[in-house]
Amino acid sequence: MSAPKFGYVLLLIVLINISNNGVDAFHKVFKKLQSKSTSLESVSPLHRTAYHFQPPRHWINDPNAPMLYKGVYHLFYQYNPKGAVWGNIVWAHSVSKDLINWEALEPAIYPSKWFDINGTWSGSATHVPGKGPVILYTGITENQTQIQNYAIPQDLSDPYLKTWIKPDDNPIVKPDNGENGSAFRDPTTAWFNKKDGYWRMLVGSKRKNRGIAYMYKSRDFKKWVKSKRPIHSRKKTGMWECPDFFPVSVTDKKNGLDFSYDGPNAKHVLKVSLDLTRYEYYTLGTYDTKKDRYRPDGYTPDGWDGLRFDYGNYYASKTFFDDKTNRRILWGWANESDTVQDDTVKGWAGIQLIPRTILLDSSGKQLVFWPIEEIESLRGKNVQMTNQKMEMGQRFEVQGITPAQVDVDVTFNVGNLEKAEKFDESFATKPLELCNLKGSNVNGGVGPFGLITLATSDLEEYTPVFFRVFKDAASNKPKVLMCSDAKPSSLKKDTGTDAKERMYKPSFAGFVDVGLLDGKISLRSLIDHSVVESFGAKGKTVITSRVYPTKAVGEKAHLFVFNNGSQPVTVESLNAWNMQKPLKMNQGAK
């Protein structure tokens, strides 16, 4: 094996060094802390979310095998029952009737047999006719080899699927055909091809620095055979974790499609979570069922410049098809961005973000994401603002709500675009660099304008979420940048030199593909104490930030709208709702 090129090695070093303790290149192991349990009485409420999914204590990461069975929603997730750092991982299991209120059950899968004795890692669920739901998951053997196993419910008549069995004929897929046994994990939901009678599923992997999604085929869901070629791969992308592969309708703008849909008017989505960057990328393309090949559309970037489900703190996502409502629903994990010491002291780490629906944008060139409508059942007191004109340097406070726990939806009208700054094409694939260069306090022509969240009254601490409009010189069309900037979010001083001792306060950014023909652009943010989920232009661009203010906490937090561009911007409409806690959120979880 030849050594990788110096440039690539240097890139890896940079990526790892800029990472935080959670959004890093690998799971960091803190053996002294991974079994340091916290009693329920000792769990710190500071920065703990109110309406997001999380257990009462300890560490969580990847959402696994979401599904609907006999009217009950199921979510499994990677969980450490003994501490607030990664380790001792089991498949925790929660159930819900409405995707809002959750009841914790006993862990469904945990290390117990030779084929998973050193780990039960991520996977997916598939509804198999005549067999019910089948979970495919990655097991870690005694010699640290990653293999693929299956588990089945003990009682199919139980809508809660409380008990799962791991049959002795596991594993079903082993890395014995040229695969990398140390990077071979996270099987997808399988899909069925009626024409040839085979099930198919993907497993993420890498070969040297090439990311790969291997395909496997089976008639009986037990004996799986590797396809002649991967469904897709890409050089210099490293390990592909948590792949997801599903169709979206080209014509139906309201409903999702089942994994096995093979009809007309559909495109396929291939999503991968890049272990190198800890971001998720997706492509839209065509899936040839005869050749088992997936080809991204020519206009869809493939690789590190690709489209993302979320441009912020968002990883290891997993979708499922809700056949009750005909929706494709997306779950995603947001780890903490504070320090390992903070996580250990507070006794918990990680949340699942609000589930989102997925549809194909009317352009056919990207997906759009939106919080599930069920979340609106938690809305309480509402305040509104209409036709509020903001000159350069002005900001207005949104009063009468609890800004640390709120759902705010605002539509801005930017009016005249003639004063928009000229767009520098050298930033065409570098929205983050542009956001860092032109932050919320850097005056522009049209923008920056947006929301100032989790702020003190004097802006000692604040997390701005904002737009800045540029003008493309060649086409004379607007180029819209969306940013969420955590750098000013907290006054906490970092004293350590190691990454685990420093709070991660990054900027996140993405471009928004919107024409602004009517001069309007919307921004919705779900704010929940230490998380800000923001949806630009009705979900064309989504950014999640984790933040930890020291003063803008609870009732001391403030919410503003602002404009720092020379061109006036009007708040055409703003609605903000206090958000209530669900009645149930995994009480009783171990």
Curated annotation (Swiss-Prot):
The alphabetized list of GO BP terms reads: carbohydrate metabolic process; plant ovule development
Q: Which domain of life is it from?
A: Eukaryota
- Provide the E.C. number(s) assigned to this enzyme: 3.2.1.26
Signal peptide range equals: 1-25
**Glycan attachment residues as annotated in the record:** N118, N143, N180, N335, N564
The active site is formed by: D62
Q: What SMART domains does this protein's entry cite?
A: Glyco_32
Task: Tell me a Gene Ontology molecular-function term this record carries.
Answer: beta-fructofuranosidase activity
Q: Give GO cellular component annotations, separated by semicolons.
A: apoplast
Top EC group = hydrolase
Where substrate is bound, by residue? W59, I60, N61, D62, Q78, W86, W121, S122, R185, D186, E241, D275
Question: Subcellular localization, per the record?
Answer: Secreted, Extracellular space, Apoplast; Secreted, Cell wall
What induces it, per record? By aeroponic growth condition, darkness, sucrose, glucose and mannitol.
Q: Give tissue specificity per the record.
A: Expressed in flowers, and seeds.
Keywords, in A-Z order: Apoplast, Cell wall, Disulfide bond, Glycoprotein, Glycosidase, Hydrolase, Secreted, Signal
Q: Name one Pfam family in it.
A: Glyco_hydro_32N
Give the reactions, separated by semicolons, that this protein catalyses.
Hydrolysis of terminal non-reducing beta-D-fructofuranoside residues in beta-D-fructofuranosides
Which cysteines share a disulfide bond? C435-C483
Q: Which family does it belong to?
A: Belongs to the glycosyl hydrolase 32 family.
Protein name from the UniProt record:
Beta-fructofuranosidase, insoluble isoenzyme CWINV2
Q: Which organism is it from?
A: Arabidopsis thaliana (Mouse-ear cress)
